[in-house]
């Protein structure tokens, strides 16, 4: 077994901080721009950064060869769950969103077991059970009342996590050997095209130009 080094711990903390802060920014921006319009801006921003790298490194051929599976994964890993989380961020806090996001490994393992017949060891099952119980304990706070829209937001976030877990399994089983850059950039491209008409329809009447929320996108 590999020993966990200080660098491994530092990288985990750094990535956790980045991932966790995204929910805070989502909470700040989603009520301002609206969920779908916000996500369209985010995927377009990501595509603008990665597309030059794809062209420069010659990864476009990989996307062209595997575009059908990349498109399928992008819907389950970007377009739909991003919008679900953005909708949830309008009604529940960033802390709760990050807790719900912790169910992604649980859903991923369940999909692997049910769909791909992967065997889970007793220790894996025990870990999943403990993780699930931990999320339930943190989620059901007796001192907090969500209301009907709050519970709908929680369900939306859970569905997003289920889609993430499904996308992970699709990627592992169908996109082996394809570069992460091609998958990510291709996914952003497909997601931006799929969301474009919905974003145009759901765009805010007045764009908050000069608003600090623009920085958080």
Put a short name on every predicted segment:
Residues 61-69, 98-101, 117-137, 147-153, ...:
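Loop-to-transmembrane alpha-helix entry segments
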Residues 49-61, 104-129, 202:
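C-terminal transmembrane-helix exit sites in multi-pass transporters
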Residues 215-217:
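Conserved small/polar residues in nucleotide/adenosyl-binding loops
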Residues 29, 38, 42, 88, ...:
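Hydrophobic/aromatic residues within transmembrane alpha-helices
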Residues 50, 71, 111, 120-142, ...:
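Hydrophobic transmembrane alpha-helices of multi-pass small-molecule transport proteins
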Residues 18, 22-23, 51-101, 137:
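Specific transmembrane alpha-helical segments of multi-pass solute transporters/efflux pumps
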Residues 30-38, 82-102, 176-182:
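Structural motif at transmembrane-helix junctions in multi-pass transporters
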Residues 1-39, 146-173, 181, 193-195:
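Glycine-/small-residue-enriched transmembrane alpha-helix faces in small-molecule transporters
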């Amino acid at each position: 077994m590999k020993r966990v080094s200080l660098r491994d711990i530092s990288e985990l903390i750094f990535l956790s901080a980045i991932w966790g802060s995204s929910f805070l920014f989502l909470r700040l921006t989603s009520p301002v721009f609206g969920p779908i319009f916000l996500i369209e801006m985010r995927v377009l921003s990501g595509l603008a950064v990665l597309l030059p790298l794809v062209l420069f490194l010659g990864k476009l051929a990989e996307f062209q060869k595997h575009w059908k599976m990349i498109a399928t994964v992008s819907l389950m890993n970007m377009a739909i769950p991003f919008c679900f989380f953005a909708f949830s961020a309008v009604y529940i806090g960033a802390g709760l969103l990050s807790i719900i996001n912790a169910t992604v490994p649980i859903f991923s393992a369940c999909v692997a077991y049910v769909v791909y017949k992967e065997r889970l060891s007793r220790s894996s099952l025990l870990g999943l059970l403990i993780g699930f119980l931990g999320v339930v304990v943190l989620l059901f706070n007796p001192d907090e009342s969500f209301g009907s829209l709050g519970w709908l937001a929680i369900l939306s976030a859970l569905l997003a996590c289920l889609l993430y877990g499904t996308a992970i399994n699709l990627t592992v089983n169908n996109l082996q050997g394809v570069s992460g850059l091609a998958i990510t950039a291709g996914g952003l491209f497909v997601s931006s095209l799929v969301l474009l008409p919905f974003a145009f329809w759901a765009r805010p009447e007045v764009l908050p130009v000069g608003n600090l929320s623009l920085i958080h996108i």
